[in-house]
Every structure is written in C-alpha cells, then in structure tokens.
Amino acid sequence: MVVIKDIVAREILDSRGNPTIEVDVSTEGGVFRAAVPSGASTGIYEALELRDKDPKRYLGKGVLNAVEIVRQEIKPALLGKDPCDQKGIDMLMVEQLDGTKNEWGYSKSKLGANAILGVSIACCRAGAASKGLPLYKYIATLAGKTIDKMVMPVPFFNVINGGEHAGNGLALQEFLIAPVGAPNIREAIRYGSETYHHLKNVIKNKYGLDATNVGDEGGFAPNVATAEEALNLLVEAIKAAGYEGKIKIAFDAAASEFYKQDEKKYDLDYKCKTKNASKHLTGEKLKEVYEGWLKKYPIISVEDPFDQDDFASFSAFTKDVGEKTQVIGDDILVTNILRIEKALKDKACNCLLLKVNQIGSVTEAIEACLLAQKSGWGVQVSHRSGETEDSFIADLVVGLRCGQIKSGSPCRSERLCKYNQLMRIEESLGADCVYAGESFRHPK
C-alpha cells in the first residue's frame, strides 16, 4: 500500500499578489502539489480562510499560521495514511483535527479551510497516481461516476469585469460569454478567444486604448456605468466574431456586494460618488430589470442575482425564469450541503456554483455536487478571483460530469492553465468524450 511519507507547506502568492498556501504531499510514487485560491467577493457563510492578520506582513494577509498548522497539526496525523482514502483523510482533518461548527455545519475556524484544502487536493493527486489513473478519472471514481464516456464542459469566459473585481462604475461583477454552439472544447476555447479579441477592438474604438486594461480575472474593465452598456458590447463583439447563435451571454451580479441591509434595497450606483436614489431598487424591482434583460439579450445564465439571504427574491425569480434560464447560487449556497438543502426547499435557484475553497475539502465539494445533480440542478465549477497556476478544477469538472466551468477570460496564465488542461484532457480522451454544448445544464 502506498502511504503518505511527508507533507510540506509553504506561503506563495496568488494572481493578485496576495499570499496563499501551497502544499506538497509525498508518497513512494512522487511529490504531489496543490495551491489554494482565494476570493474577493466572498459569501459570509463560506468556511473560514485563515489569515495571519499581522499588519507588518502583506497588510495582514499572510498565511504563515496556516502553513504551521499543516506542519504541526495535520502532517503528524496523516503520515502513514493511504492517500486513496480521500474521505477518511478529509473527515479526519474536518471533524477530528478541527471539529469547529456553526449552524451550517463544519466551519474550519480552527485549522482554516485553506490549510485543509491544500492537503485535500494534494492527497487527491497522490491517490490518482497511486491508482494509475488520470486525475479526472480518479475524481469520477471518488464520486461514483462512469469513466466510459466523459463530458467536456462549456467554458463560461468572464470578459467584462465590474463589481469588486474592477475599478469602473459597474455594480454587476461579471459579464460572460459561453460558446454553447461549438463542436468541442478546443473549438469552444477558440470561439471565446476570438470573441475576446474582437471585444477588445470594440472597446478600444468606443472608449480608447486605456479602456482595454483588464481586471482580476482577465476581463476588460472599461469605464461603463450600466449593465446594458456592457451587454451591448458583448452583442457587438459576438457579431463581429461571426458567432451569433453559437455564443450566448451570462452574468454574475454578485448582488450581496451592493445590497444595502439598512434600506433593504440594491444599490446599482454603489461605486459612484454621486448617489442616485433611482438606482436603489427593491428585490422586486431588480427582478423586473433582470427579466427585461432576458427578453432583450441572449442570456442563458444568471448568477447571484440577489443577496445571499434574500431567498424570497431568488425563489420568485427562479419561478418566473428558471425553465429557460439557469439561476446559479454562489454566495447563497457557498458549496454547503445545508445551504443547498434550504435552497432546494425554497426552490431558490436551479444550479450550484461549485467552489472547493468555499467548503474546504474535496470530499465535501463532491458531496455538494452530487446532492445538486441528484436534485435536478445544474452544477458549474468555478475558479476564484485570486487564482494560482493549479489546474485542479479542470479535472474536477470533467470527473464530476458537470458540463460547465468558469475560469475567467481567455487571458492571464492562472486562468488559461485551466482551459489548456481541458484541451489536453479532450485530446487524451479522443472519441471517448462529448462536448456538453446546449445540454450544459444537464449533460448526458
């Protein structure tokens, strides 16, 4: 039996220049590495990300405490363990070594989700190597999925950034393009890349060259003030690229970031110094705005249209548009089984955004995915705005047969490493895979 011989942790930098944790797990089969991402617009119900809070280092964002936790607490408990026992390893860390809980389950507030996840992903890679399987096939076996005919996901490219990801006036955080009409993942990525470059030219011609600077996820951040302006840019770019009908549009409102708790309203003007009362909308009024966009633009997916606790608005919106439009829960669900169960009961959305670092272990992420899929939801695997060169989520989305992934724009290496890995996987599978395409919500 292959066993864990050593675990090493270190502090590295993510794509925003902030510290994050990297973990190496060593077995007789080699050294297996994982780096943990970090979000900017984080849901309040996410598992705890442990930061040092030492103002003398990295403005308090260091992760040396998490590194020491791996070295001093996790490593001694896992030495000699079988890396193929993914659930056993994860639950040892989550339930026994940490054990902290809140109303939504294990909170990881002792060890930190970042420390636990780094070890969890590295062990997953070690387990795959021990079994002699590609990582995506090993993940499929962990989830009880078939490995006969794999599904390649539709990539959702974030090409215009707003919200907390950019310095413009846009309240909504992401505007995305999805090549559902492509024949395979390689062509889908080509469609996305070409449209991205056409979008750059459209923006340059309208707003000047300096408007083509990019945000945290590689999308452009032009100084547009309204969502309609951003959506019109996408329509123009898709047409210029020649992919009308083949590329659809999605957006992530990340509405928790502009929800005003004291007013019980959504402030679409929250990034502007001059306040406009007409931009402060109730959930009902904002729902009407969204529904107007759905009628006007080829939008197939909407993420976090309302605040993470506004289940009523989520439910009303999903009831009205959910048959034709994907309604994704991110901050409202945070990849948490108990939050998903509440949303299922309330019929609040119809798709889970799967972020492994929100919940903090591979096992819990797989369980969340399986619950969503069993309940008839879609599942979209997602990166974070603070990313690394780790391409784990590319293997995860294929292994779990989710049919859709978002990993930023076709720009910046920490985004492209996921898309490039998907092309490699498709190449290795050959005829043994299909592209999700129009069936991305419920891939066959």
From Swiss-Prot:
Cofactors that this protein relies on: Mg(2+)
UniProt subcellular location: Cytoplasm
Residues annotated as binding substrate: H165, E174, E303, D330, S382, H383, R384, S385, K406
GO annotation, cellular component aspect: phosphopyruvate hydratase complex
Entry keywords, A to Z: Cytoplasm, Glycolysis, Lyase, Magnesium
Enzyme class: lyase
Pathway(s) of this molecule: Carbohydrate degradation; glycolysis; pyruvate from D-glyceraldehyde 3-phosphate: step 4/5
InterPro entries: Enolase, Enolase-like_C_sf, Enolase-like_N, Enolase_C, Enolase_CS, Enolase_N
Principal localisation: cytoplasm
Top-level taxon of origin: Eukaryota
GO biological processes: glycolytic process
Record-linked SUPFAM superfamilies: Enolase C-terminal domain-like, Enolase N-terminal domain-like
Known partners and oligomeric status: Homodimer.
Cited PANTHER family: ENOLASE (PTHR11902:SF1)
Family stated for the protein in its record: Belongs to the enolase family.
Protein name: Enolase 1
Organism of this sequence: Toxoplasma gondii
Source organism phylogeny: Eukaryota, Sar, Alveolata, Apicomplexa, Conoidasida
Gene: ENO1
